[in-house]
Every structure is written in C-alpha cells, then in structure tokens.
Amino acid sequence: MLPRFVSYISNGTYDIGCTGQTVYVYDKYGAELVKFKDLIYAYYSAISPRGDMFVVKSTDGRIAVYSLKTLSLIKKFRYSKVNYAQDDGFCFSADGKYFINIERQGDDLHSAISVYDTAGFSRVSQFLLGDIGMLEDIEQVDGELYVIGFWRNSDLIVTEDFVAKYAEGKISEPVNITKNEYEYYNELLLNKKKGENVKNHTLATLWGFYST
C-alpha cells in the first residue's frame, strides 16, 4: 500500500512522493528505490531538467538536495531564519544550472527571490521585494521566469494582484490581474506542485493576455 502523498511528481524516469515527513523515490515502474527523512513539513519537490537531482522544500525554512544518480543526500541547509509560512513557490531554470526559490526573509510578511547555483547550492543573488508587495509562486515557461503576487500600500493592505516576469535580479513588466484570476492561477500552480498536469495553464499565458 502506497503512503498518503501530499505531492507525487514524475519526470518519466523517476517518481518523487512527499508525505511531509518522508520523501520516497520510485523508478518508472513503481518500484521503491529509496526513502529519505531529512526534513519535516516537506510537502513539495522539483526535479531538475537535467534529471540528475531533485530538491525538497520544507515550510520551516529548509531545503534538501538529492542526487538521482547516487540516490543520496547532497546538501541540506536553512535558507531563512523564518521557520514558518515558507510555502511559496520554487523552480529550476530551464537549463538546470540554477534553482530559484521564493522565501520569507526577516519575517513572514516580506518576500525575497533567491537564486542558487546548482553546482554547490550557494546563493548567487537575492531580490528583496520589501513592503510594497508579496510573492506567492514562480514558474519557468520556455526559459523565462514568471511570478504571481500582490501589491500593498504603506499600511501593508493588499491593493492589487499581479503577474510579472523575473529576470536579471528584478521583477519587470508587471500587469495587474483580477482577484479571481489570482486565486485561480495560484490553485493551478498548487495542483502542478502536487503532480497534476496543468501544462495548458501557465503564468506566461496570463501575463501575455494583459501585456499585448
């Protein structure tokens, strides 16, 4: 009997299932290869486009990196002192050279985007959004990165929801979207992290609708 997974993703060669306490790796035929217990509150993972590694993120501010070649832990580290509410999006770059993570930095009301070099998972850049808004998720589509979030006023009250590109260490070309679109696409991205096929619905599609 299979465990009760929160997410279950596949790249056609390996399947990765996360329960929150345990990470399972299966081959494409469903045979269990290994399981890891290096993190708690770890519900979602991402497989590198290169197929050589995968990353698991916990909601308490930690990341674990695993090799799919040796089926072993490569590195585990804390990316933020904020040890709760760390359930925002993450992804690899299209070439697998970088891992991009939305993080709560300072406190749970402030977002950052950190970029890590996958050669050693050292942080190579960080963009802090500050008081003006929050980021919820990030998606790589055809080599470009898109983020979804919301703007805030000086009292930290939400004023508008938006989708934008992320490139060269900054958010660019933001477009405002409706609350319904914001909720719909956040739900789609969550389902994608769970392992569901939502390829026809991307942040790139939403951004393109408003930017043309």
Map each language-model feature to its residues:
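Blade-level signature of beta-propeller repeat domains, shared across WD40, Kelch, NHL, RCC1
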Residues: V147-G195, L206-F209
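Short loop/turn segments that connect beta-strands within beta-propeller blades
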Residues: D27-Y29, L68-T70, T118-G120, A167-G169
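Structural signature of WD-repeat beta-propellers
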Residues: C18-G20, S58, E103, G149-F150
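Structural motif
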Residues: Q21-Y24, R62-A64, D108-S114, N153-A164
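Residue-level detector of Asp-centered blade-edge/turn motifs that repeat once per structural unit
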Residues: S10-N11, P49-R50, A94-D95, Q140-D142
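A short beta-strand motif characteristic of beta-propeller blades
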Residues: M1, A31-K37, S72-S80, S122-L128, ...
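Repeated scaffold domains used in trafficking and secretory/extracellular systems
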Residues: L2-Y8, I40-I47, N83-C91, D131-E139, ...
